[in-house]
């Protein structure tokens, strides 16, 4: 049967083809002879098992494996011969006539026309980790391990205040009866800023009425956009007790030597990794937005977009489960809400592949190795994690895709109009 290609949509194709029966049988016979040379079956010496027994024992499985291999090989050959560029995996079904006739249905990459990235504008941000950043991180680590003791003076920024509150908004009282118990660290923003400022200087047992105007988008709808009297009573004020940066403290973060210089070196490496990730993410987002704006008119493969939307939904459902919530109430068609974002993801992904192909960009193996080391370094046993990735094709495929995307994004940025911007570490990671 000759290969037949049909267009069944703007981007969907149907390819009808067959696997030659003589080729299938030849490959099956060859594979069965290989098995016969080493097969061990009770009642027969190794290598002396009759061909009929080998056929009965292994024939069905071998034929299925060989057919699958030839099926893929024949399809790939037909796709190459007709210069088709698939935008996802093909679905293969048996044709109505003949056991070795098949129909492959798939979507193709759309025609993007000329891709001119010289019109793009990017901001090349640079930043570096300083000793001040390391000092700040050490202080943050001390704060994470802090304990509390009762303060003998009024509350200050950084103090933990336990309190009871009730609010009066016109004729409405919240709560209707009693009070609400809560706590906040002054300056943390856990409570509304005007309330936290009003608590400064208060001690245990103090009561105060605060005049507060809440913004229109305040999370408590009954208070949003209203001038409210908030009645507060301080139950307790506690001040933080920070651990000393000594050998014990340093070792608790996995620095075996317990030395301050090694601790600072580890922190620097972690901050530099975080900084690099932030700069790359910002550039990826900036370039991605311009790719989307420039090629939003190009139709995307609908099945590929739907698949991406379902993957995004599945990820959200998994996050819901991990948070301890029940996702069973999510409707079956919830993926529709992700279709727009999925379309943009597919667009950027296909453009990245198209740019890489047109400009013969090749995956940099050294960069893949560096990325693997970077990922592994965030774990307690980096060598084991590195080998785990190396030996898992699916994990490696994800890393390789990430690296290839970064290479293409940088290729685009190098050819776009550039503005240089020097940032501090904090500015870089917060943008």
UniProtKB/Swiss-Prot annotation:
Span of domain PPIase FKBP-type: 158-243
Pfam families: Trigger_C, Trigger_N
Alphabetical list of InterPro entries matching this protein: PPIase_dom_sf, Trig_fac, Trigger_fac_C, Trigger_fac_C_sf, Trigger_fac_ribosome-bd_bac, Trigger_fac_ribosome-bd_sf, Trigger_fact/SurA_dom_sf
Catalysed transformations (reactions): [protein]-peptidylproline (omega=180) = [protein]-peptidylproline (omega=0)
One Gene Ontology cellular component annotation held by this UniProt entry: cytoplasm
Keywords carried by this UniProt record: Cell cycle, Cell division, Chaperone, Cytoplasm, Isomerase, Rotamase
Enzyme kind, highest EC tier: isomerase
Main location: cytoplasm
Subcellular location per the Swiss-Prot or TrEMBL entry: Cytoplasm
Keyword Membrane: no
Claim: Chaperone is one of the keywords in the record: yes
GO terms for MF: peptidyl-prolyl cis-trans isomerase activity; protein folding chaperone; ribosome binding
Any Gene Ontology biological process: protein unfolding
Known EC number: 5.2.1.8
PANTHER family linked to this entry: TRIGGER FACTOR CHAPERONE AND PEPTIDYL-PROLYL CIS/TRANS ISOMERASE, TRIGGER FACTOR-LIKE PROTEIN TIG, CHLOROPLASTIC
Recorded domain comment: Consists of 3 domains; the N-terminus binds the ribosome, the middle domain has PPIase activity, while the C-terminus has intrinsic chaperone activity on its own.
HAMAP family: Trigger_factor_Tig
Job of this protein: Involved in protein export. Acts as a chaperone by maintaining the newly synthesized protein in an open conformation. Functions as a peptidyl-prolyl cis-trans isomerase.
NCBIfam families (alphabetical): tig
Family per similarity comment: Belongs to the FKBP-type PPIase family. Tig subfamily.
Annotated protein name in UniProt: Trigger factor
Species in which this protein is naturally found: Xylella fastidiosa (strain 9a5c)
Chain's gene name: tig
């Amino acid at each position: 049967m000759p290969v037949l290609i049909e267009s069944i949509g703007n981007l969907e194709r149907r390819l009808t083809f067959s696997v030659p029966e003589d080729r299938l049988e030849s490959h099956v016979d060859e594979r069965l002879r290989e098995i016969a040379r080493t097969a061990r079956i009770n009642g027969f010496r190794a290598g002396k098992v009759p061909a009929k027994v080998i056929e009965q024992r292994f024939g069905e499985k071998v034929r299925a494996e060989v057919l699958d291999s030839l099926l893929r090989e024949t399809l790939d050959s037909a796709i190459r011969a007709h210069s088709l560029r698939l935008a996802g995996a093909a679905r293969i079904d048996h044709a109505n006539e003949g056991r070795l006739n098949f129909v492959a249905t798939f979507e193709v990459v759309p025609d993007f026309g000329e891709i001119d990235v010289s019109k793009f504008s990017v901001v090349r941000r640079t930043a570096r980790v300083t000793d001040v950043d390391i000092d700040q991180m050490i202080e943050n680590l001390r704060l994470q391990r802090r304990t509390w003791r009762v303060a003998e003076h009024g509350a200050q920024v950084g103090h933990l205040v336990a309190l009871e509150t009730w609010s009066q908004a016109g004729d409405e009282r919240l709560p209707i009866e009693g009070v609400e118990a809560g706590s906040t660290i002054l300056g943390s923003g856990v409570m509304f800023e005007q309330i936290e400022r009003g608590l400064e200087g208060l001690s245990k047992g103090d009561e105060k009425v605060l005049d507060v105007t809440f913004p229109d988008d305040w999370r408590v709808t009954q208070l949003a956009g209203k001038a409210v009297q908030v009645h507060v009573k301080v139950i307790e004020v506690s001040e933080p007790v920070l651990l000393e940066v000594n050998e014990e403290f340093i070792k608790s973060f996995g620095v075996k030597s317990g030395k301050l210089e090694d601790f600072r070196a580890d922190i620097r490496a972690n901050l530099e990794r975080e900084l690099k990730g932030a700069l790359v993410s910002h550039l990826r987002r900036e370039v991605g937005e311009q790719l989307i704006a420039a090629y939003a008119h190009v139709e995307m493969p609908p099945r590929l977009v739907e698949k991406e939307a379902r993957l995004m939904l599945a990820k959200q459902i998994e996050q819901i489960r991990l948070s301890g919530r029940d996702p069973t109430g999510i409707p079956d068609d919830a993926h529709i809400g992700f279709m727009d974002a999925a379309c943009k993801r597919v667009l950027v992904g296909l453009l990245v592949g198209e740019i890489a192909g047109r400009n013969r960009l090749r995956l940099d193996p050294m960069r893949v190795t560096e990325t693997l080391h970077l990922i592994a370094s965030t774990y307690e046993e980096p060598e084991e994690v590195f080998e785990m990735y190396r030996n898992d094709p699916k994990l490696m495929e994800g890393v390789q895709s990430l690296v290839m995307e970064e290479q293409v994004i940088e290729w685009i940025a190098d050819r776009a109009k550039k503005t240089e911007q020097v940032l501090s570490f904090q500015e870089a990671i917060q943008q």
